[in-house]
Amino acid sequence: MSIKVLLVDGSHVMRSAIRQLLKNELGIEVIGTATSFAETIALTTALKPDVLLMDPHMPDEREYTPKLVKSQILLHTKCIVAISLWNDDDTKTLAQSFGAHVLLDKMNLYAELIPAIKQFCPSVSIPKTTDSFRNDSKRPAGPSTEERLDAP
């Protein structure tokens, strides 16, 4: 059984890059992509992803408060991982207000994304074949720059 990921980002280039990164990971399947909070709510409700991988800065962010988005998505996903190019205090607070378990820097996703899912999404398990592959891999063993966000 694979981990179902819904990828939410306003940039086509970033969505494509992350999709390619996850495509190479055993046991993880990108089941959809969203480019706005409106799409995120609809797709999370319909697809019920295990992991919601989202940028907290979206084109329609003025129309959707974090409280509204959080109330609609938390019922249908097990774990939220926020990603952003900005890792300042305001973005960390924003990610936390959406219910994110962690905020990752987009510049470090190659090394940090899979380890972060394993660390911060304990109810989601990556198959053992992936774990053994990771142990033999030359990639870094774990996240190096992410910070855990305490859920409200």
State the predicted function of each range:
Residues 82-83:
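Hydrophobic/aromatic residues positioned on beta-strands within the core alpha/beta folds
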Residues 2-13, 18, 22, 52:
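Conserved acidic segment of CheY-like receiver
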Residues 33-51, 59:
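Acidic, metal-coordinating helix/loop segments flanking the phosphotransfer/catalytic sites
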Residues 26-31:
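A generic structural motif
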Residues 45-47, 70-78, 98:
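Conserved phosphotransfer cores of two-component systems
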Residues 64, 86-104, 108, 115:
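Alpha4 helix (beta4-alpha4-beta5 surface) of REC/receiver domains from two-component response regulators
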Residues 112-117, 124-152:
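CheY-like receiver
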